[in-house]
A protein has these predicted regions:
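Residues within mature, well-folded domains
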Residues: 20-162
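C-terminal motif of bacterial Sec signal peptides marking the signal peptidase cleavage site
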Residues: 15-18
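Bacterial N-terminal signal peptides that target proteins for export
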Residues: 1-8
Length: 162
């Protein structure tokens, strides 16, 4: 393949991938067209207005989770990237549950256990102000959120001796 053909093919692939990204879906798009472009969602949940929410997660490797909300006529109303510190900070200790966390953020990137907490720690990868971070949601054995903590995610060849 000649150089210019390879370049055209690469550009077409990039353009096609960009069109199939949740944030590029246009309001008013029919649900069937969005699902055809994006594939099967991670989760689907009913909305109070008779519509439904499609949740597309890029966890565990990615740092985004998108809510695509559709009205009762199955038309796209909004697209929201929900993996933000503000949304995790809005979780209410002792009130929010495993189910509400799952409905908001989708499945975690990692589920961990530590000696000092009797329950699961759900870890989500996110990007906050271009800084890779992790949100750790502590969920007790009854399925209730007890704490949310944040850590910076160290990526690549980190050398603490530098």
């Amino acid at each position: 393949m000649t150089g210019w053909r390879a370049l055209v093919l690469a550009a077409a692939c990039v353009a096609a991938a960009g069109c199939a990204s949740p944030q590029w879906q246009k309001p008013g798009a029919p649900l069937a067209a969005v699902e055809q472009a994006l594939g099967r969602p991670t989760l689907v949940a009913p909305l109070a207005n008779g519509g439904e929410r499609l949740l597309y997660s890029r966890q565990p490797a990615g740092q985004q989770v998108y809510h695509l909300d559709f009205d009762a006529q199955r038309r796209l109303v909004s697209v929201t990237q929900v993996l933000t510190e503000a949304r995790f900070q809005a979780l209410r200790d002792g009130v929010d549950t495993r189910e509400s966390v799952l409905a908001t953020f989708g499945p975690p990137a990692l589920v961990e256990h530590v000696a000092r907490f009797d329950g699961d720690i759900w870890t989500y990868r996110l990007l906050e102000n271009l800084t890779p971070r992790q949100a750790h949601v502590h969920i007790d054995p009854e399925g209730v959120v007890r704490r949310v903590m944040f850590t910076d995610e160290i990526l690549g060849d980190f050398d603490p001796g530098r």
